[in-house]
Amino acid sequence: MNKTKRKQQSNKVALKRDYKSDSDSDGDADALSTNDGFVEPEQKPIISKPPQKKKKYKDNETNKVKPPTIEEMKELRDTRNLFHSNLFKLQVKEMLEELHLKSKYTDYIDKWLENFTTFTEQLEDGLMDRCQLEVPLHLHKKTINFIFSKPEQPPQLIGAASQGTLLQPNFIVDIALEMPKKCFEKDDYLNLIYDQKRALYLAYVTDKMKSSSIYREDQFAYNYYANNPLKPVLELTPFAKIGKHLKFRLFITAPVETFRLGRFVPSNNNIRPILFNDEWNLEEQPLPSTQHYNANVLFDLTLSANQSLLNKSFQGRRNFQDGLLLLKVWLRQRQLDVGFSGFSSYILAMYIVHLNQQRVLHQSSSSYQVARTVWNQLANSDWTKGISLAQQATQEQLSFVVGFYDVCFMDITGHYNLCSNVPLAVYKRVREEAKLAVDLLNDMKINSFSYIFMQKCPLYTRVDNILKITKATSVQQLLLLQNHTEMKYDYANYGYPQMLKTLTDLLEKGLAQRIHGIIPLETAVSPWSVDSKAPIIGQSIQLGLILNPEHAYEVLDRGPASQDDDEGAAEFRSFWGDKSNLRRFQDGSICEAVVWAAVKDSPAKKRLIVKDICLHLLEHHFKLDKDDVQFIANELDIVYKLSPWFKVNKLMDKTKMKEELDQNTDSEALTPNVIRCYDELSRQLHGLNDLPLEIVSISGVSPIFRYCESQPVLPQTRLLANRRIHTNHVLRVVIQLGQSGKWPNELAALRALKTAFLIEIGEKLKEQCHLNWSLTSEGLLIIKRGYCFLIELAHSKESALLKQQINERGITTYVDNPQSRDLERRHYILPKVSGALHSLHQSHSAYGPTVLIAKQWLASQLIDDGLWSPMATELLVAYLYQQRHAPFITAAPQTGFIRLLQLMSLSDWQGELFLLNFNNSWEDQQIADLEHSFRSDRESYPPLALATSYDQQHAGRLWTTDETPNRLVLNHVSKLARHALELIETNLMSKSLQFLRPAQLFRASNEGYDLVIQLKPELLANSLNYDMGSPFVDFGQPNFNLPLAGQDRLAHIVAHLRSAYSDYAAFFYKPHGGKELAIMWKPPNVFAPKAFKVNELQASTPCVGNRNQVQVSRDTLLEDFKLLLKDFYARICTTEDLKREQKQHSKPKRYFQINPKQFENESMKPKKQIHKPTKAKTKTINTKKLKGKKILLKSKPIKALV
């Protein structure tokens, strides 16, 4: 589809949404309206009119505006009743116009079919001994004598080509060629003989086509239709240019009278034990039914009758065809039509026919009504009870068939189940997606077009965990140990559906309420050459688990009481094995139970309970080891774990902590400790005596109070002898005092009084609670149990004074400015948003960890806080958890991160406003007004526009600015997200047993940078997170020196570099533990010679030979960079130099393995400035000589922590 064209068309039209109720939102109501505004084109005869005399135009009030015609009024009425807005209608109409098949394709298809019909008429009967091609069948074969007989019926178009609903971008035209009845004998329906003859017939026709001059230059390949090894088809790609987008697929079928259809009822057996050399005692056990194999044969036998029904229903009805096109786009975007168990568009086409038969759809229903009615009916359907296209079908017949299949939808003959291979979980998934589509259409607050039709929703983004079994030996072992021998006959010994059924039944029983469903994740089989043997497929399986957050992480499975239900207890023990134990519960009952984790375990460990259950069941029932199975659940959680370099036992020994810390802890598990400490501090603040004013509210506004701090926060704050506080994290708290009319009306005086209040609070805390404190320019620093809190005092008068301006007439006015907005955000709006995000995490426990992974990913890509606001990440993830763009909100942080990557890769930053309506406090009209303001005055909003319901008049402009992030950074992040998604999808859907390593995602590329400034590692503390390494140099020994509270010198210097030199270079660094600063020069035209101007001489030098011109010198810029970096600077080099050094040196060159002298020798300073102290001078330091100089404090207590 041409997205650019659609966007341009949408932008050209000035549109307003009509927020009136949709009276036809449900099933039967859809059927009552007969038009949605789409006027189907009709050929009208041209009627010549006699020339008329020109009439003089009278300029009066009645002739200025022409009244609308009946057609226009009808179109407006239908637009109001059926669509959100005229925009949605135009988008659907334009998409359908793009989807319609061009005449060049239809002409080519008709000509090709005509030539192929002529070709089949020229075929001659004969033996198969002259066929040189491989037979496309790889199952149990029986030696048979087969004589080819030419087709008696001409080939016919089937499927989408016959219905006029071929879908872009690659058109697949299905052709059916019917074998004559004389090719078969009476008992050929038994033991796969029919399937072998069908494959032989296909090989013979293919061989003759290859030798024909008509098709000699075309490409021939075999493939399996719907990944079914019993359904080989020929794929022919024309040699002509049209073959880039068009291919033909040849099916071989049989006439309906070949076999009596009654032989293929679900209860019959058509595969005998002799085929597999099995022994079977018919007196002890009857032959198993082969309902799925029978349906496989019935597909061919009933194809002609079903195709006739489709042709009758669709041909000449553009509304049905377009409605099916809309449904096919929706289904394709969700990948629900792929593989052996896929819900194909063929089923949707038949369902449209069924609804038409039931008079739910009318012949005059428009294309939009067709799609909407199908979704609405599908969302409220129950195919487990059976539906049928056959007029004579009775409920008794359906009840009989239902017992053999998960889902039942009988065809026109009443014998073939169209959903014979569709598992119940896939049908439920389609039903949930249909319900979501209806909900999106009914939501007047959003334009649902992009969510329904445009955005890809791969199945792996809809599941929380993925189970993969890809080893051939493991698959064979599983099939050997499964106890359902009848399945081998039912599926003709095809392994994949047997594994799918076996594993699904086992895991659904074991996981019970912990999951919403188990979905197979399939990929289409690749075609193979007609000269090669058919490949063996079905030797691997991938299952996606959709977790139920309410029960997924329960630590115990309780079984029946042994004294009341002996058989149930025995069955429970047999199912769970040695994991089951007798336990006494608080109610006094003694029951069998399985315990998976302790109640006090970390959330990350509890998220592995489902994994532990699945692996245990596979080991207990099928003897599969952990190495034989890959369970993808929490591979990315490692990025916010505590670094193994940091030893918590030393911290606990030094600080004598009461709480025990686990070395395997992470940021999420450490957060409750901080919140408990904060709650205790809040109680102490409220309990302070003799304060001039009462403290009325206390709000924690740091990310950790909403579970969004990606760095582990440990109780390691230290107060040194000089009253300076050193810590890694400063936790911000905003307090408000009671009302008083004595606050001054001048800003300086008010701030001085605030400082006095903070000093008073600090002294009271010291006196009454024995807490150390220190005053800074930002607020009051309090140390409590090893954590450092920064208390800020909020007063509404301060914001008003910041807005106060006196104009030329002496009149006082109040105008918003950046300082006042920032103060309002920090003191009044952020506490509310922080509380809302905290509540969101309490409702959806995966929210916080998803933010942690996202923040770590952005930081690893050298996107620091100066380029991308951390609050933007938190709000974007919250937007995902608030919007119902998926049937289920994910319970896995890893899946939440994948969905965020998808949002970043697909979002139109320029045209989308991200609204977060916390607690539904925004009225519909307020949202409409904000969206109208955003569309009409887009330039006044930042490139990334985020708005919450607490932002008041600053909505959309509060959390991001024009530079954080700017458009270049947004585009860069979108590209990074697309690349990350490609890596994830490739690894998830591959047959490999190994998932991608986190370092593949969480380490930036070192390509594209012009220079790298290496910084002295001993002056920069490492991140407490698990370090994935630097993109430029190798690992080295880290340091964990504590910085001065609230100071990030490197971030401050980089901010200064950007403010001064952003016109000449872009600067990138890793904000957590980064030891390098990467530089990208701006385009060469920035450094081109320019005219001499006094105010544009920054880093400029005169041009050689032309004193009237100057140009910016990169060497001068580098000297400025080194001057700003001062003590941090070690050396400057290119990425090529670093790569060369890594190859030449075995030792890493990042941390303390390098002698500090080496940094000096390799720096770009003049040699005369290099000091080389002797060993005698390095043993002691004369502190008297250092008095009065700025030095880096290195206290032994801080250093001794690690």
From Swiss-Prot:
InterPro entries: NOL6/Upt22, Nrap_D1, Nrap_D2, Nrap_D3, Nrap_D4, Nrap_D5, Nrap_D6
Keywords: Chromosome, Nucleus, RNA-binding
Localization of this protein: Nucleus, Nucleolus; Chromosome
Record-stated family: Belongs to the NRAP family.
Subunit architecture: Part of the small subunit (SSU) processome, composed of more than 70 proteins and the RNA chaperone small nucleolar RNA (snoRNA) U3.
Keyword Cell inner membrane: no
The protein, known as: Nucleolar protein 6
A biological process from GO: rRNA processing
Source organism of this protein record: Drosophila willistoni (Fruit fly)
Region (Disordered): 1-64
Family annotation (Pfam families): Nrap, Nrap_D2, Nrap_D3, Nrap_D4, Nrap_D5, Nrap_D6
Cellular-component GO terms for this entry: condensed nuclear chromosome; CURI complex; small-subunit processome; UTP-C complex
MF GO annotations: RNA binding
Taxonomy of the source species: Eukaryota, Metazoa, Ecdysozoa, Arthropoda, Hexapoda
Function: Part of the small subunit (SSU) processome, first precursor of the small eukaryotic ribosomal subunit. During the assembly of the SSU processome in the nucleolus, many ribosome biogenesis factors, an RNA chaperone and ribosomal proteins associate with the nascent pre-rRNA and work in concert to generate RNA folding, modifications, rearrangements and cleavage as well as targeted degradation of pre-ribosomal RNA by the RNA exosome.
Gene3D superfamilies noted in UniProt: 1.10.1410.10, 3.30.70.3030
